[in-house]
Amino acid sequence: MADLDAVLKCWGAVEADFNTVGGLVLARLFKDHPETQKLFPKFAGITGDIAGNAAVAAHGATVLKKLGELLKAKGNHAAIIKPLANSHAKQHKIPINNFKLITEALAHVLHEKAGLDAAGQTALRNVMGIVIADLEANYKELGFTG
């Protein structure tokens, strides 16, 4: 619970500007792992200022709002995880490793924009590790090994 509290302490900076932070997180993900951009067909041709692209920022905001919902559930997130896993496995076909990659992008952006220190970044990785493990368990139930 201490890890979750550490992450939630800086979450206000995310909520203050979901679009900007979301755009930065996805831009960081695509920069560090260019292959991930191909998983988002509507972003495939976007180059240049990815973070400033309205569609990328809007999708990043959607991702962060859902993550905020998961965080605020404080571990009681089965009802949130199940449909998320279902859509990401069946519809979007997102390999589980990509959730680890976006966690690293988020840690980097939160360090820069919200002052998340090394301990906070470790807390974020720990919290996301639990979320990702639960997503992966749902993926397995669905027979998705991506």
From Swiss-Prot:
It comes from the Eukaryota. It is found in: Cytoplasm, Sarcoplasm. The keyword Manganese does not apply. The keyword Heme applies. Keywords: Cytoplasm, Heme, Iron, Metal-binding, Muscle protein, Oxidoreductase, Oxygen transport, Transport. Pfam families: Globin. O2 binds at H59. Residues 2-140 form the Globin domain. It catalyses: Fe(III)-heme b-[protein] + nitric oxide + H2O = Fe(II)-heme b-[protein] + nitrite + 2 H(+); H2O2 + AH2 = A + 2 H2O. One of its GO terms (cellular component) is sarcoplasm. Heme b binds at H88. Its EC number is 1.7.-.-, 1.11.1.-. Nitrite binds at H59. GO terms for molecular function: heme binding; metal ion binding; nitrite reductase activity; oxygen binding; oxygen carrier activity; peroxidase activity. It is an enzyme of class 1 (oxidoreductase). GO terms for biological process: removal of superoxide radicals. Monomeric heme protein which primary function is to store oxygen and facilitate its diffusion within muscle tissues. Reversibly binds oxygen through a pentacoordinated heme iron and enables its timely and efficient release as needed during periods of heightened demand. Depending on the oxidative conditions of tissues and cells, and in addition to its ability to bind oxygen, it also has a nitrite reductase activity whereby it regulates the production of bioactive nitric oxide. Monomeric. Belongs to the globin family. This is Myoglobin. It comes from Katsuwonus pelamis (Skipjack tuna). The lineage of its organism: Eukaryota, Metazoa, Chordata, Craniata, Vertebrata. The gene is mb.
